[in-house]
A protein has these predicted regions:
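Short, hinge-like loop/turn segments at secondary-structure boundaries
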Residues: 16-21, 94-98, 122, 140-143
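Phosphate-binding site of ATP-dependent enzymes
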Residues: 110, 117-121, 128-186
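A conserved helix-loop-beta module that forms one wall/lid of the active-site cleft
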Residues: 1-9, 56-134
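A generic local structural motif
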Residues: 35-38, 64-65, 90-91, 109-110, ...
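Conserved residues at the C-terminal ends of beta-strands
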Residues: 52, 106, 185
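ATP-binding N-terminal substructure of ATP-dependent carboxylate-amine bond-forming enzymes
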Residues: 1-76
Length: 186
C-alpha cells in the first residue's frame, strides 16, 4: 500500500491514509504497478508501515510523524517517527563533527560574513530544505547578502566549501544502531 504524507489522517480514532495497493516487480524501468484505484485504508491493519518522508522539515512533516506515533505497537513503523522527527538531517550531522568541514548554524548575517572572511569559500544551505534547493556558494568576490536574506527568517547552515564534494557525498545506512553500508550520491 502506497500513500503520500499529505494523505495521512485520523478519523474515528483510527490512523488512516488514502492511497493505492501496488505490486513490486523486478524491472529496472517499471518496478511497480498500481493494483487498485485510490482507496482509504486503516494503517493499523498493516503489519509494517515504512516511513520515508522527504523534507522540507515543516509542520506538515512533523504532524505526520506525530500521527504515525499513534499507531498501535502491533503495527511496526520502520524508521521510528520520534527518531525521524528528533534527528533533522543537517543538525544530526553534528554527532559526527570530526567528519565535517568547518560549519556554522546561524541566522545572523554578521556572523556569516565573519565566517566567510575566515574560510574564504563557503556554501549556505537552508537548515530544513532538501534537494539542493536554496543552496548557494560564495567566496569573497561574489558574496551577496540579498540572496541570503530570503532564507534568514530561520537559521541556515554555512560550511566551508570542500572540493571533494565534486566526487559526491555519502548516505550512511544504519539499522537498529548497526552500520549497514553507504551509498554515494553524485
Amino acid at each position: 500500500f502506497y500513500y503520500n504524507p499529505k494523505d495521512l489522517f485520523i478519523k474515528e480514532n483510527t490512523i488512516q491514509a488514502s492511497g493505492y495497493y501496488l505490486e513490486l516487480q523486478l524491472d529496472e524501468k517499471n518496478y511497480f504497478n498500481f493494483k487498485s484505484n485510490k482507496i482509504i485504508a486503516k494503517l493499523e491493519d498493516f503489519q509494517f508501515v515504512f516511513l520515508r518522508q522527504d523534507p522540507p522539515f515543516d509542520m506538515n512533516y512533523i504532524t505526520s510523524t506525530y500521527i504515525l506515533d499513534l499507531l498501535p505497537s502491533s503495527t511496526i513503523v520502520v524508521n521510528d517517527p520520534t527518531a525521524v522527527r528528533n534527528s533533522t538531517e543537517k543538525l544530526f550531522t553534528f554527532n559526527f563533527k570530526e567528519f565535517m568541514p568547518p560549519t556554522l548554524v546561524t541566522k545572523d548575517l554578521n556572523i556569516i560574513e565573519e565566517f566567510l572572511d575566515k574560510e574564504e569559500d563557503i556554501v549556505t544551505k537552508p537548515l530544513y530544505g532538501n534537494g539542493g534547493e536554496g543552496i548557494h556558494r560564495f567566496d569573497k568576490s561574489n558574496f551577496n547578502s540579498k540572496i541570503l536574506e530570503e532564507y534568514l527568517h530561520l537559521p541556515i547552515m554555512v560550511q566551508k566549501f570542500i572540493n571533494e564534494i565534486n566526487d559526491g557525498d555519502r548516505r550512511v545506512v544504519f539499522f537498529d544502531g548497526e552500520y549497514y553500508g553507504s551509498v554515494a550520491r553524485i
